[in-house]
Amino acid sequence: MATPGSTAPSSTPATGRDGVFASRRIVVGVTGGIAAYKVCTVVSRLAQAGAEVTVLMTPAATKFVGPITFQALSGRPVYTSPWEHVESNDPQHVSLARTADAALVAPCTMDTLARIVHGHADDVVTLVLSAIDRAKTPVLLAPSMNDAMWNQPATQRNLAQARGDGYRVIQPAEGWQACRTVGTGRMPEPEDLLAALAAALTDARP
């Protein structure tokens, strides 16, 4: 069962070009966790469904999946630094934030969650998020960390604050983790992330 402010997985969304993702502009922020590999499937499915997907990556994320992978899957440039495309007349982070229909941060590590909640904007993911009006554009966070990190009081405080600030937290799953333990904190599967994103887009429609 989802807690208030959380998003529970729902039924699989329609992913054809006439479905909920068609012609939608989706920002996907990838941060430094092993679950980043799952986001490849999410980006591929969104692109196949007709979405315009822009992938943002923290420096740590590029250690798990290369930017060229997401570029190939999305068919669009991938941003790994706030200093890319500075020749544009429209500041990159403002432009991406203003035109997005939804944003998904996956995996959202313990560190990234803390930095989002405390207003940091020093990498391309947090910078773009800082410019999104969450009253108009849904921003989903998919936490991914081991069980001990998930249950830290600081993490639970940050989750509560994130929900209070209008972020939609996708409840993590329980299961086998990369640290060779079983517990809560496992990032949901791509189908669950897509379902949560589809539900958020449906809720956000006028």
Model-predicted regions and their roles:
Residues M1-L141, D147-P206:
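A cross-family phosphate/adenosyl-ligand binding-site feature
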